[in-house]
């Protein structure tokens, strides 16, 4: 059986700030059906410790980045874990990356270098309890493992790096390099050096045996200056080992037929009536008036990348068309303020909940008519996949994974009954306004709208196809050993 060590800074359901956690939490069970054993390595944050009380130590360091560290092996929520217990690094309040003040921990470089170093020690066979064939690292927080493994003294596992969002790169001052424990030759343009500093993601891209990102379109986009965030040149040079594989959805967690967060679960044959009960629950929760027009929802970080500043400019038109908006999200203070102001301006028509609420995110997908996703760039996106599964029609910008996963409701697609949503381009307020107008017109034609919903609900958004693609990639790497 092929053995994989997945390494990430967050894993659902133990700890989650975004879609990365969903992906890393769902992939092991999907791969198990393909005869692949995957264990997941993550840090022991306070939120994680309670779930790993039965874990047993398999390795220890007397001093790793300034303190004692243990690697624990255990199980939780059906997943097999190797957890890096380093109280001096990970036992602190806030989310995995930010302190209570909302700022990055100054020692984040040290925290995630420790995670990467531990992963490399497992991948090199130094820790005998689990010897993987491949170390599959996710994003900059785990990317430095590729550099450590490149310089390992013994034959090491192959390394795959998955980039979930190239905007987050882990760029730190050159002064930290001496503390990383890498040989001096690693601080070079062909190594971890990046614009005079240390780039964790850049080093991972340089040393990984294979690189994946989370959709074919995004794999193409990040090789261009517009989307590559300064790493496009390196990615063009490594294009032959770069693959785009669309994420899947954990269909046991996201299942409208058995979702406890819904007021009334439903299946394809009764979704029209039952989704109305969920819409009423949303209206009551957010103080929205009943109305014959469509109810749009947003479940998103409130940032410029997600196009939320563009949506703010469209709210007058949205309400003017007889539509309503239910928004769940948090992020930039100005955007939170803008949406709250809009809710005050249009009581009963716009409802806003700031923060994150897993249950409400499910209810919005299960009762809103459409979900707005106007991202400036979107590596894959999961909310549009949840929307497909729940019959909440995605209205998306034509970028990255959104372009790959949504079939636009143009005339030909509507005739074929293959349309699953609405795409728009370019990513600006006038295009989004026109997309909202299209959605509102289509919603008035209930036969056409129900056809779009049904086609979306029939779409296979599970991990099955994606897991098969990863299996092919793993096999290809191991053939070249």
Question: What are the residue ranges of the model-derived segments?
Answer:
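Catalytic cores of nucleotide-sugar-dependent glycosyltransferases that transfer UDP/GDP/TDP-activated
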Residues: 1-481
């Amino acid at each position: 059986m092929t053995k994989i060590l997945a390494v990430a800074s967050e894993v659902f359901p133990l700890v989650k700030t975004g879609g990365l956690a969903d992906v890393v939490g769902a992939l092991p069970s999907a791969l198990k059906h393909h005869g692949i054993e995957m264990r997941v390595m993550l840090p022991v944050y306070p939120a994680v410790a309670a779930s790993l009380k039965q874990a047993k130590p398999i390795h220890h360091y007397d001093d790793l980045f300034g303190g004692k560290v243990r690697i624990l092996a255990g199980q939780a929520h059906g997943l097999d874990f190797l957890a890096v217990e380093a109280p001096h690094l990970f036992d602190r309040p806030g989310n995995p990356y930010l302190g209570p003040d909302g700022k990055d921990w100054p020692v984040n470089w040290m925290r995630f270098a420790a995670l990467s170093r531990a992963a490399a020690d497992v991948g090199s066979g130094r820790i005998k309890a689990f010897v993987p064939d491949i170390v599959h690292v996710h994003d900059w927080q785990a990317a430095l493992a590729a550099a450590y493994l490149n310089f390992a003294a013994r034959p090491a596992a192959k390394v795959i790096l998955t980039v979930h969002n190239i905007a987050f790169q882990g760029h730190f001052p050159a002064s930290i390099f001496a503390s990383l424990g890498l040989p001096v030759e690693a601080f070079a343009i062909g190594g971890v050096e990046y614009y005079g500093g240390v780039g964790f993601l850049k080093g991972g891209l340089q040393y990984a045996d294979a690189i994946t990102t989370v959709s074919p379109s995004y794999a193409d986009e990040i090789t261009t200056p517009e989307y590559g965030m300064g790493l496009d040149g390196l990615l063009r040079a490594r294009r032959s080992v770069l693959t785009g594989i669309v994420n899947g959805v954990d269909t046991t967690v996201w299942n409208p037929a058995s979702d406890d967060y819904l007021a009334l679960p439903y299946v394809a044959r009764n979704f029209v009536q039952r989704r109305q009960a969920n819409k009423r629950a949303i209206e009551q929760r957010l103080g929205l008036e009943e109305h014959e027009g469509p109810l749009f929802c947003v479940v998103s970080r409130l940032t410029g990348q997600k196009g939320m500043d563009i949506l703010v400019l469209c709210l007058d038109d949205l309400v003017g068309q007889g539509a309503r908006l239910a928004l769940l999200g948090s992020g930039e203070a100005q955007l939170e303020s803008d949406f709250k102001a809009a809710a005050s301006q249009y009581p009963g028509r716009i409802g806003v909940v700031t923060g994150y609420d897993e249950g409400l995110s499910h209810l919005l997908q299960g009762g809103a008519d459409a979900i707005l996703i106007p991202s400036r760039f979107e590596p894959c996106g999961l909310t549009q996949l949840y929307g497909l599964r729940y019959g909440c029609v995605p209205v998306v910008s034509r970028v990255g994974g959104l372009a790959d996963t949504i079939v636009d409701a143009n005339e030909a697609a509507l005739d074929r009954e293959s349309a699953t949503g609405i795409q728009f381009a370019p990513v600006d307020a006038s295009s989004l306004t026109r997309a909202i107008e299209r959605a509102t017109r289509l919603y008035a034609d209930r036969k056409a709208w129900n056809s779009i919903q049904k086609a979306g609900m029939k779409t296979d958004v599970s991990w099955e196809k994606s897991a098969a693609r990863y299996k092919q990639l793993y096999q290809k790497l191991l053939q070249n050993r």
